[in-house]
């Protein structure tokens, strides 16, 4: 065994790789849903304006005012405690997406307000195009660079969210593996500190490396997409 075995004889390296698949796929799936919801909500608010824009932004501000960790734990605790791993996987993606779209919607709404008065958008309205078609066809190309950069920078938060839930026993459960679950198992095993402290270091190092890499990649993409950069 490359990294040894845990207290039940399972290969730590194999579980680390399997946990990467679970943790990273939750991040990618969650951020994809978040970007779609945030773009549509922000685009519609910027397009229609008025009362719809006011109501949508007050709801967004309400969500953003609540500490995300407490809201995450509250939403998870309100659900049935005995989901299997597949059901838990879906629920974590839904919960993280439901909490993450508000920030994206607020930024997209601000960008859409200026686009709504553009001549080509007014021409599309005069030709009878539907609001959704206008938002996708004319707004999306102008905000796509922000969505890509925002998604890259937000993936670490989703990985950390899954790790936090699993570490607290509210996320992925045995016999599946995730980085947060591996941290929880290492903490609860009294033999770890005496015989195999690397059981705790390996999932922690994987989370740290993933968060660092995505943050660096996001900074690079943000600099590349900055129109003010020389």
For the regions a language model picked out, list residue spans one by one.
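Alpha-helical transmembrane segments of integral membrane proteins
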Residues: 5-230
């Amino acid at each position: 065994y490359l990294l040894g075995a845990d207290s039940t004889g399972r290969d730590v390296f194999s579980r680390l790789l399997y946990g990467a698949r679970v943790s990273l796929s939750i991040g990618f799936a969650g951020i994809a849903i978040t970007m779609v919801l945030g773009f549509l909500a922000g685009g519609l608010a910027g397009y229609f304006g008025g009362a719809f824009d006011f109501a949508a932004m007050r709801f967004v501000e309400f969500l953003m005012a609540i500490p995300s960790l407490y809201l995450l734990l509250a939403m998870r605790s309100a659900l049935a405690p005995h989901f299997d791993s597949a059901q838990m996987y879906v629920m974590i993606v839904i919960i993280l997406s439901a909490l993450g779209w508000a920030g994206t919607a607020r930024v997209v709404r601000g960008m859409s307000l200026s686009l709504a008065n553009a001549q080509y958008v007014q021409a599309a309205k005069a030709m009878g195009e539907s609001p959704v078609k206008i938002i996708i066809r004319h707004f999306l190309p102008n905000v796509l660079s922000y969505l890509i950069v925002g998604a890259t920078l937000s993936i670490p938060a989703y990985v950390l969210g899954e790790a936090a839930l699993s570490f607290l026993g509210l996320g992925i459960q045995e016999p599946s593996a995730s980085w947060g679950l591996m941290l929880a198992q290492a903490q609860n095993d009294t033999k770890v500190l005496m015989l195999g402290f690397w059981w705790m270091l390996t999932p922690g190092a994987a989370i740290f490396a993933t968060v660092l890499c995505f943050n660096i990649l996001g900074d690079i993409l943000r600099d590349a997409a900055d129109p003010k950069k020389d």
